[in-house]
Amino acid sequence: MSKLVLTTDFPDLKLAARGKVRDIYDLGETLLIVTTDRISAFDVIMNEGIPDKGYVLTQISAFWFRQMEDIIPNHIISTEVKDFPAECQKYADVLEGRSMLVKKAKPLPAECIVRGYISGSGWKDYQATGSVCGITLPAGLKESDRLPEPIFTPSTKAELGTHDENISFEKMVDMCGKDIAEKVRDITLKIYKKARDIADGKGIIIADTKFEYGIYEGELIIIDECMTPDSSRFWPKDSYQPGGPQPSFDKQFLRDYLETLDWDKTAPAPPLPEEIVRKTGEKYMEALVKLTGKGK
């Protein structure tokens, strides 16, 4: 197991932002995205990290970005440290396997969620209103049911420590413009359907996932991460049983543990037992191995 990376400190590089999981450095023409082993749940960053999580997320993102190049270009320039600018080389031991050199795109203001199954906040909305983000769904669906067709349900992009909010497609049109909103919706559904079929052949159900897009040199590209256990719900196909929550290869395991505690879901986070940290790490690594055939 490699050394835990909870935060990065590269004095020679300009830190542009620290997100819940990623540290982003501005290299002038490009960005360096370093995926740490931090983990958040309910928008609160835990004190403990998950070993090799940054590696898993980076490798899964790179796998999916490659698979989707026939649908949309992505922001990756390279995931090989040897290709990074000279000033990054001295940090190679930290960067190896968990970092990407990427194009500097202008992010769209909405997050793009696609749901193929009814779960999570979508299930809660459906129980209350019979619809999700203004999309009416058939009556009588059970929790975790497969939807007749995948649905596109955008959300706002929340500031660190606050919650994203589901919005209607019409609201996204107001935020991004009609042409971009429609293009993004169509591409999101196309990516999801392709990924769903690939994952299905590897024993994984992608219940839902979230994408981010940006504009680079006038062109729409996909940015951030791509169908990782942080941005998606991955369920094991062999134990899928609608009618309740599903076991998963993602941080749902951690969320489920936190739900058993007397914790109000605001910072500071409660300490995590070693077993929860270990099992969460195993679930992330299992997702990587199942999808790509390679671990670490």
From Swiss-Prot:
Classification via Gene3D superfamilies? ATP-grasp fold, B domain (3.30.470.20), Phosphorylase Kinase, domain 1 (3.30.200.20)
**Known EC number(s)?**
6.3.2.6
Q: Which residues form the signal peptide?
A: none
What are this entry's molecular-function GO terms? Answer: ATP binding; phosphoribosylaminoimidazolesuccinocarboxamide synthase activity
Q: Name one GO biological process term.
A: 'de novo' IMP biosynthetic process
Q: Can the keyword Transmembrane helix be found in this entry's annotation?
A: no
Q: Which InterPro entries match?
A: SAICAR_synt/ADE2_N, SAICAR_synth
- Please list the reactions this protein catalyses: 5-amino-1-(5-phospho-D-ribosyl)imidazole-4-carboxylate + L-aspartate + ATP = (2S)-2-[5-amino-1-(5-phospho-beta-D-ribosyl)imidazole-4-carboxamido]succinate + ADP + phosphate + 2 H(+)
Enzyme category, top tier: ligase
- Identify the keywords attached in UniProt to this record, alphabetized: ATP-binding, Ligase, Nucleotide-binding, Purine biosynthesis
GO CC, sorted alphabetically, is: cytoplasm
Pathway it acts in? Purine metabolism; IMP biosynthesis via de novo pathway; 5-amino-1-(5-phospho-D-ribosyl)imidazole-4-carboxamide from 5-amino-1-(5-phospho-D-ribosyl)imidazole-4-carboxylate: step 1/2
- Matches recorded under SUPFAM superfamilies: SAICAR synthase-like (SSF56104)
Q: Give the family per the record.
A: Belongs to the SAICAR synthetase family.
| PANTHER family found in the cross-reference section | PHOSPHORIBOSYLAMINOIMIDAZOLE-SUCCINOCARBOXAMIDE SYNTHASE
NCBIfam families xref list? PRK13961.1, purC
This protein is called what? Phosphoribosylaminoimidazole-succinocarboxamide synthase
